[in-house]
């Protein structure tokens, strides 16, 4: 046999071996690039959140199959239809929301039939786009510091004013209730704030209660001598609002600023997005802000 024959067989064998090697490498790369499931990502969150995971919690899957491979993560304050549509358009099929998706704290609307057209269309949209919705509320608040509060303090630029003995309390440079409300609205991107109290009252002692803490915690904050103004997300008008109005009428140096639930916690979920990126890899993570639903008539 000629040397050319052996050379040809050698290169043929080498070529087959190279192809096999490339095939194995490629298959290994595919295995490494396999998209994580929503369930796997939640397990990572549980491992990194830094507080014991509670059995009784609203931090559970609300829609979709948890074993769905994740194409992208949309982190949001509230999984409204608008947020879901934007997430789907960006190929983000795993939505992590702070607040309920289906109009009730437990995501089971009381007194609403499953045939309700709004509820039904929202469920159908999630199913059509192979989306998974998971709530991250309790344990994000349980972190030290509270994840929502941390994000809000950063957004407001109040880090240097925050009290060590009372993390929800702040000692600001002297301002008025009017200026405080206006500056808060500007920083949080909301023009729809409501205020109880004298707009010209000079204040320095502030308390921040994001979201909807409830009457007991809100009034306990307002009754403190070291709190002149309480900023809340939302509250019942016949509870904390009435209490604040009575305090003002009685001549007490008190004011209440109602920010709105979404803008009062939104920056906290943007903070969550940044935190997730420190340990969740191999998948796109984006903060999708919820829009302020209210507007002012002109």
Model segments located where?
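Bacterial N-terminal signal peptides that target proteins for export
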Residues: 2-15
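Hydrophobic structural segments
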Residues: 8, 20-298
């Amino acid at each position: 046999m000629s040397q050319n024959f052996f050379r040809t067989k050698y290169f043929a064998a080498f070529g087959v071996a190279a192809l096999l090697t490339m095939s194995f490498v490629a298959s290994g790369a595919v295995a490494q690039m396999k998209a994580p499931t929503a369930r796997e990502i939640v397990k990572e969150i549980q491992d990194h959140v830094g507080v014991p995971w509670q059995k009784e919690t609203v931090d559970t899957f609300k829609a979709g199959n948890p074993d769905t491979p994740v194409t992208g993560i949309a982190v949001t304050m509230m999984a409204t239809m608008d947020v879901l549509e934007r997430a789907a358009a960006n190929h983000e099929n795993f939505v992590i929301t702070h607040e309920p998706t289906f109009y009730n704290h437990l995501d089971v609307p009381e007194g609403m039939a499953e045939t309700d057209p709004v509820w039904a269309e929202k469920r159908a949209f999630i199913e059509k786009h192979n989306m998974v919705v998971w709530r991250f509320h309790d344990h994000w608040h349980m972190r030290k510091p509270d994840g929502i509060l941390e994000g809000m303090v950063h957004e407001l630029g109040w880090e240097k004013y925050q009290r060590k003995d009372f993390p929800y309390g702040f000692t600001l440079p002297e301002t008025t209730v009017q200026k405080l409300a206006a500056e808060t609205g500007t920083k949080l991107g909301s023009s729809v704030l409501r205020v109880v109290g004298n707009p010209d009252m000079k204040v320095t002692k502030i308390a921040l209660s994001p979201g909807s803490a409830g009457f007991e915690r809100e009034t306990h904050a307002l009754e403190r001598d070291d709190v002149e103004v309480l900023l809340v997300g939302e509250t019942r008008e016949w509870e904390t609002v009435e209490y604040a109005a009575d305090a003002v009428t009685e001549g007490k140096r008190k004011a209440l600023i109602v920010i709105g639930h979404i803008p009062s916690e939104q920056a906290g979920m943007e903070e969550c997005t940044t935190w997730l990126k420190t340990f969740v890899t191999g998948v796109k993570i984006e903060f999708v802000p919820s829009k302020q639903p209210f507007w002012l008539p002109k």
